[in-house]
């Protein structure tokens, strides 16, 4: 057997997805087309990989850190010409296919302990997005993180991450995933989400994105405080009041109560007035 004697390792945050219904919903959300080149992160024993290879995709490229799993995956899919495998850390290795082409979709049950940095690698930052965005990413995440990504203003889990991701992409829920869908079962609930990055022409212009990022860092450091206090260092009170009145923003609101669009308007107001330079 390809994986004989191999057990899930905590240091790699390994939990094998064994729920056929969830695997089907992941593939449905990926909407795989014949010319698609798929990137899978952390394929584990290959349950999702097998489904991806059974689709019409032209190529499936996986990145796996666990050397023992790499050996098993190569044995299991040795006869699959459309499959390529990169051993290494997904945060540092090249994500191109074996022939040098880039993947256009990401479909993955990602290790929860690298969610933040991996999202940044796949999507970029608000002020430095990736040059060539993926068409879509179907990711199995810890439910708490997924909720923060798609949270609405005013919800307790709405955060700077919510604003950043929603200004970079359209984010929707695919399905909930309970612990019993994995072996071994994790201690947390999970969720599959669909992330559809905005096209380059739909992104914020660089200076505006930089200003938004600066405001988010300043405001969400003290998310329980009113904007009057969190933005006090951004500009003098009189000018802050005038800008808030012009934009219809109440300075008694807290950071998590403003929508992504409102943060953009606030940043645009600062740029228009040229009141303060964004942080480098």
Swiss-Prot record:
Leader sequence residues: none
Family note: Belongs to the class I-like SAM-binding methyltransferase superfamily. rRNA adenine N(6)-methyltransferase family. RsmA subfamily.
Amino-acid positions noted as binding S-adenosyl-L-methionine in the UniProt annotation, renumbered to this chain: 15, 17, 42, 64, 89, 109
Protein name as annotated: Ribosomal RNA small subunit methyltransferase A
Biological source species: Prochlorococcus marinus (strain MIT 9303)
Keyword list, A-Z: Cytoplasm, Methyltransferase, RNA-binding, rRNA processing, S-adenosyl-L-methionine, Transferase
Gene assigned in the entry: rsmA
E.C. number(s) listed in UniProt: 2.1.1.182
Residue pairs linked by disulfide bridges in the UniProt entry: none
Function: Specifically dimethylates two adjacent adenosines (A1518 and A1519) in the loop of a conserved hairpin near the 3'-end of 16S rRNA in the 30S particle. May play a critical role in biogenesis of 30S subunits.
Compartments reported by the entry: Cytoplasm
InterPro entries: KsgA/Erm, rRNA_Ade_diMease-like_C, rRNA_Ade_Mease_Trfase_CS, rRNA_Ade_methylase_Trfase_N, rRNA_adenine_dimethylase, SAM-dependent_MTases_sf
Molecular function as annotated in GO: 16S rRNA (adenine(1518)-N(6)/adenine(1519)-N(6))-dimethyltransferase activity; RNA binding
CDD domains: AdoMet_MTases (cd02440)
Species lineage: Bacteria, Bacillati, Cyanobacteriota, Cyanophyceae, Synechococcales
Main location, first listed in the record: cytoplasm
Catalytic activity reported: adenosine(1518)/adenosine(1519) in 16S rRNA + 4 S-adenosyl-L-methionine = N(6)-dimethyladenosine(1518)/N(6)-dimethyladenosine(1519) in 16S rRNA + 4 S-adenosyl-L-homocysteine + 4 H(+)
